[in-house]
Curated annotation (Swiss-Prot):
Keywords: Glycoprotein, Glycosyltransferase, Golgi apparatus, Manganese, Membrane, Metal-binding, Signal-anchor, Transferase, Transmembrane, Transmembrane helix. Pathway: Protein modification; protein glycosylation. One of its GO terms (cellular component) is Golgi cisterna membrane. The keyword Nucleus does not apply. Its cofactor is Mn(2+). It comes from the Eukaryota. This is N-acetyllactosaminide alpha-1,3-galactosyltransferase-like 1. Residues 1-6 are cytoplasmic. The conserved DXD motif is involved in cofactor binding. The manganese ion interacts with the beta-phosphate group of UDP and may also have a role in catalysis. It is found in: Golgi apparatus, Golgi stack membrane. Substrate binds at residues 95-100, 187-189, 209-212. Glycans are attached at residues 87, 99. Its main location: Golgi.
Length: 321
């Protein structure tokens, strides 16, 4: 009898192994098919859809020749012709944690449903402490939503960031990288006010900090302690990036997260602590983004809008009292 049980168990394990191998081969085959199809379509050259000369009043190109997206510099229709044929899916992840307001989340998703990647497949990922206080969210066509409960506990603000990014790392590795071609991670206390389209897509996407864009690099609040992982010297640096929006391919977003987690671990070894935003700035100082979003994508409406900003794309939500 024992022999039969062991034989049956071995057979079941063999079947599971075969199914796993088949799934892996199918997944690899689908990825290769997409890569092959993508490679047969020539991606538009930068000069065919982006013209920095149309905005001489702003920094429209970085020192490493990445476009800084301002209203008037890009032609979305050229890129639409390319991405429509690829039938891409874009992910938008948001954390609903701590003292977040369900009304703020509802406003954010409602605005994203209206303006984020219109005409493309979009998956909204909500990572929450729990789902009991999440609002009802009605979505349009080509939009789906997934909710995940965050695992782990946090004690401080930075512990919360670390917990969030650990969860995001796991979800990218286990799910997201197989579901979307591009991924954005945003904070829920924003609202999208104008079209957030395919001009923002790229291998890695960084958001300029609206306040620090108008300051000199020496004034930027980089990590200045030499022993800290996020250290950037006073004579170095080009931009200061905001943590409210980050994007790219799932694997590039994963690389950023792993850089942050490693930096946190290294700092704790040296009894140091730094913010997620400073680690993010160190990452983009080392690995330059291929798309940079202007302050139009990160504006605080409490401040007077400067003439450089023609159309606010993303704004901070007013605090709900």
């Amino acid at each position: 009898m024992q022999y039969k049980k062991e034989t049956l168990l071995l057979i079941l394990l063999a079947i599971l192994l075969a199914l796993t191998q088949r799934y892996s081969r199918t997944k690899d085959h689908l990825q290769k098919m997409y890569t092959c199809w993508r490679d047969h379509l020539e991606e538009p050259q930068l000069e065919s859809w982006f013209n920095p000369k149309k905005r001489p009043d702003v920094i429209a190109t970085t020192g490493w020749l990445a476009p800084v997206l301002w209203e008037g510099t890009y032609d979305r229709e050229v890129l639409e012709q390319y991405y429509k044929r690829l039938n891409i899916t874009v992910g938008l992840a948001v954390f609903a944690t701590g003292n977040f307001s369900s009304e703020s989340l509802r406003r954010f998703i409602k605005s994203a449903n209206k303006y984020f990647m219109v005409g493309y497949n979009v998956i909204f990922y909500i990572l929450a402490d729990g789902t009991s206080n999440l609002p009802y969210l009605e979505l349009g066509p080509l939009r789906t939503l997934k909710m995940w409960r965050l695992s782990g506990e946090e004690m401080t603000y930075e512990d919360s960031n670390l917990r969030n990014m650990n969860n995001m790392r796991y979800k990218i590795m286990e799910h997201i990288q197989y579901e979307v071609n591009f991924l954005f991670v945003m904070t829920a206390n924003q609202i999208i006010k104008n079209h957030f389209g395919v001009e923002t897509l790229g291998r890695s996407v960084a958001q300029l900090h609206a306040w620090w864009y108008f300051k000199q690099p020496r004034e930027f609040p980089y990590e200045r302690r030499r022993k800290a992982s996020a250290f950037i010297a006073f004579e170095e640096g080009d931009f200061y990036y905001h943590s409210a929006i980050v994007g790219g391919t799932p694997l590039d977003v994963l690389d950023l997260i792993e850089h942050y987690i490693k930096g946190i671990i290294d700092d704790r070894t040296n009894e140091l602590s730094s913010t997620y935003e400073r680690h993010l700035n160190k990452y983009f100082f080392i690995k330059k983004p291929v798309r940079v979003l202007s302050p139009e994508y990160n504006w605080d409406p409490r401040f007077k809008t400067p003439p450089e900003i023609w159309h606010i794309k993303v704004a901070w939500q007013p605090r709900i009292t």
